């Protein structure tokens, strides 16, 4: 999903920076407020950031100018919401661009928008929707994590198709081509990521359910149900 350095035309680089900036600014505000109110969340923030870094660094070849990999953003979106997750994501993306030749600084805005904003937003909405209909918490975490991953690549496909429309068929043909190539590797990766993050969520609930309850991620009753069902 990381679009490589210098691959996008300048106007699209500037456009995605402009679109992403308000989300990052609000995320920084939310993050500062959260840390001031509850410093006990710092270790969990670090865990969410580490998941994003490690999983999104496991890249596989895909379309020219990009790659396939898990995103790891679903866990942060569930725990802290999409805006704080966007801040964690941009930190990871800057580090990867500077030290791992993964992504790029000129394409940072585009990469943040797809992986750090759109993916977490959908994951957060899916999780909140699942809570509203009393969906099983473990199933809910799996769906939110997996769909956040897949939606990230839908957005990347849109970004690439807008920048490089097909000579015959235009934007839609280009989008179908990019999305089809991504789907070959990304659907299995999203399923694996969903399972992995679900297991991580269960473990966090075992050792620090109080933080999840305080953040409103799950209720005391849901925490107890998870412990009883998977003990």
Curated annotation (Swiss-Prot):
* Gene3D superfamilies cross-referenced by the UniProt entry: 1.10.1760.20
- Source species, please? Methanosphaerula palustris (strain ATCC BAA-1556 / DSM 19958 / E1-9c)
Q: Which GO terms describe its molecular function?
A: cobalt ion transmembrane transporter activity
Top-level lineage group: Archaea
Self-association and partners: Forms an energy-coupling factor (ECF) transporter complex composed of an ATP-binding protein (A component, CbiO), a transmembrane protein (T component, CbiQ) and 2 possible substrate-capture proteins (S components, CbiM and CbiN) of unknown stoichimetry.
Gene from which the chain derives? cbiM1
Annotated pathway, please? Cofactor biosynthesis; adenosylcobalamin biosynthesis
Q: PANTHER family, from UniProt?
A: COBALT TRANSPORT PROTEIN CBIM, PTHR43627
Official protein name in the record? Putative cobalt transport protein CbiM 1
The top of its lineage is: Archaea, Methanobacteriati, Methanobacteriota, Stenosarchaea group, Methanomicrobia
A GO cellular component annotated for this chain's UniProt record is: ATP-binding cassette (ABC) transporter complex
Q: Tell me the function of this protein.
A: Part of the energy-coupling factor (ECF) transporter complex CbiMNOQ involved in cobalt import.
- Where is this protein primarily located? membrane
């Amino acid at each position: 999903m990381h679009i490589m350095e210098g691959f996008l035309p300048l106007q699209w680089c500037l456009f995605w920076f402009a679109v992403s900036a308000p989300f990052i600014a609000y995320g920084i505000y939310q993050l500062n407020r959260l840390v001031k109110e509850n410093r006990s969340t710092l270790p969990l923030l670090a865990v969410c950031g580490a998941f994003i870094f490690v999983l999104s660094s496991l890249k596989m070849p895909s379309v020219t100018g990009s790659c396939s990999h898990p995103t790891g953003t679903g866990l942060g979106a569930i725990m802290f919401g999409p805006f704080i997750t966007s801040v964690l994501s941009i930190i990871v993306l800057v580090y990867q661009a500077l030290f791992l030749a993964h992504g790029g600084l000129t394409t940072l805005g585009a990469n943040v928008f797809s992986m750090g904003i759109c993916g977490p937003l959908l994951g957060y909405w899916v999780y909140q929707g699942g809570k509203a209909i009393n969906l099983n918490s473990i199933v809910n975490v799996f769906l939110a994590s997996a769909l956040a991953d897949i939606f990230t690549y839908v957005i990347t496909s849109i970004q690439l198709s807008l920048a490089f429309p097909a000579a015959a068929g235009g934007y839609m043909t280009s989008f179908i081509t990019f999305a089809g190539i991504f789907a070959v590797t990304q659907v299995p990766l999203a399923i694996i990521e969903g399972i992995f993050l679900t297991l991580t969520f269960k473990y966090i609930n075992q050792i620090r359910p109080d933080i999840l309850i305080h953040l409103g991620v799950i209720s005391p009753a849901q925490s107890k149900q998870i412990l009883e069902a998977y003990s």
